[in-house]
Amino acid sequence: YVMGSVDFSYNKIGSEGRNISCSMDDYKGINASTVTLSYNEIQKFPTELFATGSPISTIILSNNLMTSIPENSLKPKDGNYKNTYLLTTIDLRFNKLTSLSDDFRATTLPYLSNMDVSYNCFSSFPTQPLNSSQLKAFGIRHQRDAEGNRILRQWPTGITTCPSLIQLQIGSNDIRKVDEKLTPQLYILDIADNPNISIDVTSVCPYI
């Protein structure tokens, strides 16, 4: 049996000291579908959960202290961990991330359908998750640097060709010229609060 969900929010996980009392050889992971670790002090992506074969489909890591998720955080150097392919939903909002590694491509996460990296520090669009043919929704609202400046300016050209994507949340940034023809398939598009945006919506006017 697999538990529906476990919630470890509002703790001090990831702070100084040892969080796991046993050795990694004895650690068996978490037998749950949804794992919530929001509002902690996590600086390093919890690779241990996936290395031990935890059957996680949704992981919520919002409101932590991660600045990067380096390569081999979701997979070993060769091949993949046993159950990482089960992961469909990833919430990384309210961290300090500036980039994603190739761990987030379809070769590791073939069924990724929902991902949100809003309220981070991306200055360029992380295209790795767009490689997933199952991706339906992606959020990347409100990207700021340490001084609070809007730093995401470039539209992710080609995003309308993602076969399953129906929702893109890219508001509250500084997106400029959009040189791409929109399609009605992308029927939830949040571009609000991009003060310098230039976009042609003629192709989707009949659907608005």
PLM segments and residue spans:
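Consensus "Asn ladder" position of solenoid repeat domains
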Residues: 11, 40, 64, 92-95, ...
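Leucine-rich repeat domain C-terminal region
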Residues: 77-85, 137-151, 166-167, 172, ...
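LRR N-terminal entry segment and analogous cap-like coil->beta motifs
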Residues: 1-3, 11-14, 22, 32
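Leucine-rich repeat
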Residues: 1-2, 27-31, 51-55, 75-86, ...
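Canonical leucine-rich repeat
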Residues: 16-17, 45, 69, 100, ...
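Conserved hydrophobic beta-strand positions in leucine-rich repeat
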Residues: 4-8, 33-37, 57-61, 88-92, ...
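Extracellular beta-strand/beta-solenoid scaffold signature
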Residues: 17-24, 70-73
